[in-house]
């Protein structure tokens, strides 16, 4: 069966349109049938629709005899950690970096996003419309101590990191890291300047956060380094002391060098995606580090990491997984690991980042239509000809939006623009 509701990062849509309370209730019942008489940990970001979806999912779960532990506002990686500690299932209600009108449902088990096969199983149960009547009804309970458990775990990981004297600026995207990031940095000794720390559900990701890093670059006043998170806290982008944005590729490059120097980089291998910049690949190759590429999506990065034995991988967007620290992308852990590498080296972030080439790369979204075909002879010729001239072309349907993304990378920006427009015309014709 083709997956109907789940995309590359769970179920996602505009609340009240493609994502409804009715669907959330059914997801809860379907998941509840799989879980049995166990428990599910539920967290959410700050979106207004989060309360409604939380109630609907909880109702579905409890009707199937499952107890629900409500964490309230908590980052996705925090819920993942809690499911790993308790060996249980979890649900995160979040649309990550998307605007406030969107929301989503992510399902976790034992620290990881559930595999495709389990997503299909949930799909099939929803589509069948049949759910057995359970003699036992579950209960919902507050689990606000989950936040403290997560913060405690992060502080234990970085127990030797002393940030005394560091000036750090944080853009919390008015999202889930409002409950964790500032407190952790301050506990480790940093002086913290905070932006966008509201839990008003209408402001999440609005002109701020990891998808708008220029906000922090322009507004930070006191920070020697800045970190900007997305709505659910699984992404992070950095800003250096010269107010330059340091994207996920460059963060991965810095971490790879730091981990290799410590003897912590498994197999001297890093996992990226088809969107990973060629500049990072060249930088790593010069230092004896191999880059493996996979499909876009942190779940696919994780799969390739487990398959290859790598412990570092991620995406340009700031989804970065450090597998000996966390089982999922965790913006806060990534930021702290970067601070640790910088402190050990005694170097500024800008010095490190400038060593990593970032070849010109243009991405354009084209609205996906029913008649649009990626199996197009003219398209194939453009891609082959461009590739033969040293340009890297990636054309892929988005897993979270109804668009096709065209990405072209190379060393001549004007030529890249021409290739992108040529491909756009073919797709739209």
UniProtKB/Swiss-Prot annotation:
A single Pfam family it belongs to is PGM_PMM_II
Q: Which GO terms describe its molecular function?
A: magnesium ion binding; phosphoglucosamine mutase activity; phosphomannomutase activity
Q: Which cofactor does it need?
A: Mg(2+)
> Which amino acids does the record list as binding Mg(2+)?
96, 230, 232, 234
Catalytic residues, per the record, are 96
- List the coiled-coil residues: none
In terms of InterPro entries, this protein maps to: A-D-PHexomutase_a/b/a-I, A-D-PHexomutase_a/b/a-I/II/III, A-D-PHexomutase_a/b/a-II, A-D-PHexomutase_a/b/a-III, A-D-PHexomutase_C, A-D-PHexomutase_C_sf, A-D-PHexomutase_CS, Alpha-D-phosphohexomutase_SF
Q: Name one GO cellular component term.
A: cytosol
What are the entry keywords?
A: Isomerase, Magnesium, Metal-binding, Phosphoprotein
The family note in this entry says: Belongs to the phosphohexose mutase family.
User: What is the protein's species of origin?
Assistant: Thermotoga petrophila (strain ATCC BAA-488 / DSM 13995 / JCM 10881 / RKU-1)
Task: Tell me the protein's name.
Answer: Phosphoglucosamine mutase
Record's keyword annotation contains Aminoacyl-tRNA synthetase: no
* EC id: 5.4.2.10
Q: How is it modified after translation?
A: Activated by phosphorylation.
Which GO biological process categories is it annotated with? carbohydrate metabolic process; peptidoglycan biosynthetic process; UDP-N-acetylglucosamine biosynthetic process
* Class of this enzyme: isomerase
- PROSITE patterns, A to Z: PGM_PMM
Reaction(s) catalysed by this chain, per the record, are:
alpha-D-glucosamine 1-phosphate = D-glucosamine 6-phosphate
